[in-house]
Amino acid sequence: MPKIINILSVDFEDYFCDLPFAKWNEYENRVVETTPVLLELFSKYNVKSTFFVVGYFAEKFPKLINEIQEEGHEIASHSFSHIDLRKTSKTEIEKDLTKSFDVLENVTGEKVIGFRAPFFSIDASNSWILSFLRKYVKYDSSIFPVKSPLYGVPNAPRQIYHPSQKNFIENDESEELVEIPPLTNRIFSCYNLPVAGGFYFRALPYFLIAN
């Protein structure tokens, strides 16, 4: 049986990230207490992960990001202020993402090569963002090949591919940007069941997670 290679990632954000950014300072941050617990668990099982970090927290808690980095985990971008890219202007998107890259690179001293959109919010309505990302990162992990009331591009590839500039759900090997879709499980030969993400991990039966 071929060896199964799993890619683990963490969206580094807090419980209030879905609220308006202007109100974030009104809430208690929990990432300072919970992150060491997660790092200890990863260390126990010798697991390395990619942390998609909201830039706000890197700016506020740079030492915490350095601790993640020192444990051998990759630091990637999850925007600066956890914006929904479908509901934000092009100017604000470019400003927010550029700020996230700058903050993360200043904190880590390393080039950021990965990005994941909050709410998996890249779809046909704003696929131009991939062209913007090509100038900054090597891979994206925002296109969730599922049908959901909240997000998703159900006809997008389930496997790693290179998004074409003509059609973002088609593979073009000549493109350098790599798309790493969040994990799905194909059922009934016609439906992609979302598996990646904390909600699905908690809600789905164990046999689906295990497979």
Identify the residue ranges that each predicted region occupies.
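Active-site-adjacent pocket scaffolds in enzyme catalytic domains
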Residues: 110, 117-211
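Short acidic, glycine/proline-rich loop/turn micro-motifs
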Residues: 19-23, 86-87, 191-193
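Aromatic/hydrophobic pocket-lining residues that form the small-molecule binding cavity
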Residues: 31-35, 61, 93, 97, ...
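Alpha-helix N-cap and loop-to-helix initiation/capping positions
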Residues: 23-30, 88-95, 197-199
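Short, hinge-like loop/turn segments at secondary-structure boundaries
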Residues: 25-27, 68-70, 93-96, 131-134, ...
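Short loop/turn segments at strand-loop or loop-helix junctions that form parts
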Residues: 8-14, 78-80, 181-185
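Metal-dependent polysaccharide deacetylase catalytic core of the NodB/CE4 family, i.e.
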Residues: 45-126, 138, 142-151, 175, ...
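Active-site beta->alpha N-cap acidic-glycine motif
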Residues: 1-74, 116
